[in-house]
Amino acid sequence: VSPMKSLVAAALVAVGLPALAQSPREAKPAAAGREALAIPHEKYTLSNGLEVILSVDRKLPIVAVNVWYHVGAYHEQPGRTGFAHLFEHMMFQGSKHVADDVHISMLEQLGGTDLNGTTSFDRTNYFQTVPSNQLETALWLESDRMGFLLDALTLEKLNTQREVVKNERREGTETAPYGIAREKAWQALFPLPHPYHGDVIGSLKDLDAATLDDVKGFFRQWYAPSNSTLTIVGDIDVEKTKALVQKYFGTLPSTPKPALPKVAPVKLTKPVVIRHEERVARLPLLSVQWLTAPYLAEGDAVADVLATALATGKASRLYRRLVLEKQLAQSVSASQQSQGAQSVFSLNVVARPGVTTDTLLKEVDAVLDEVRRQGVTPEEIDRARTRYDTRMLAGLQAVGGMGGKADVLQSYNHFVGKPSYVEEDLARYEKVTPESVKQFTRDTLSNDARVILHAAPPDSGRAPTLPKERK
């Protein structure tokens, strides 16, 4: 999951279809505007391999401390899934020098905010924003769980968090509207043995089978300074901050950087149709999905623009046709879910009572055929750019939290190795044209290489029965 596209929404990873906000862009930002978006920073590496990114922002007397471990569900082995997400929970349970379950409460008592962790297919992150005079405490807490978590990890803690994760899956997938259906579609997009096949929570069978030694081995392999990046943004003195970083992180042992898995891209060679009997939601859902280019690769920005043109706002094509004009749908949505290895473009339509998903599919295909022939208008592209840029600007007002400056620096550093990549990112959207949208829809959103999910409750295709008139 690309965190840069989570400027207004945290990654929702439980069913493999995160609700990722699109990276904001402006229609035609002036050069001065682009320079204003650049984030001044310094990047360096400790002798043990820990990357450090520092950026000064003195608007408020606060500091964001953000740690990314470059490991997610993508890096897990068959039979050992869900470990990265499991550690998202375990990392708050205490370490050698920090008592059990006090990490968050300690920071809150000191005025900390935005305290959380998230897991995606591509990375795991932990973040907090603290008063600038509490920076040292935040660094101590982060360094202690990086270097000494296993000293306090017990089978009892593992079993407790294992049950928490099971309940999270039940709530997020098994009893959620369309949860099981969406999972089936995701698994059809990424068949085994692709590491994107499951959801980030992992297989409950794998979690049940995991031993304490299994879990500790995963931590030793991936949660080392050499596979981590520490970003600090806010009201800091750079030299004093460097000294604190060295004090708390510099003595952690160095280990070789783990090798990344080599996975061939998935290619769909025929349409896959899934018909699921929906037992939770009361209205039918049509979801059509395609495999697309990785985050920041050619085609990723075009997909963002098309998603906005199709289903964002009352003027969008699918909303206008299906909700307003033909009154066949309750809601429509579209997204480019950008990820490190391979992305997914999704169209989702919830039917009105009595309308079938087959009817919706015909209408969706008619709209796509129109785009394949004509592209979209320059005005639609401009609206998309403006929407993205507004969100980018909003995100960069904060130093911490999901989509704040620290997270933006981390995301670009993770995916392209350049923390301040804002100008280059913006430039991708400047290159989108009606012709490029038309070509993308023709070449990538093919009817012959997609997953079509029909999730419908029993008898949902029947026209609603009107109450009998009383005599």
Could you say what each language-model-derived stretch is?
Residues 1-8:
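Bacterial N-terminal signal peptides that target proteins for export
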Residues 8-9, 19:
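Cleavable N-terminal signal peptides
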Residues 23-27, 150, 192, 224-225, ...:
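An aromatic/glycine/proline-enriched structural segment found at the starts
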Residues 53-55, 60-78, 82-86, 100-148, ...:
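M16 family metallopeptidases and their MPP-like homologs
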Residues 81-93, 308:
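Active-site recognition of the HExxH zinc-binding catalytic motif
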Residues 93-97, 147-156, 172, 376-377:
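Short, polar/flexible loop-turn hinges at active-site or ligand-entry regions and domain interfaces
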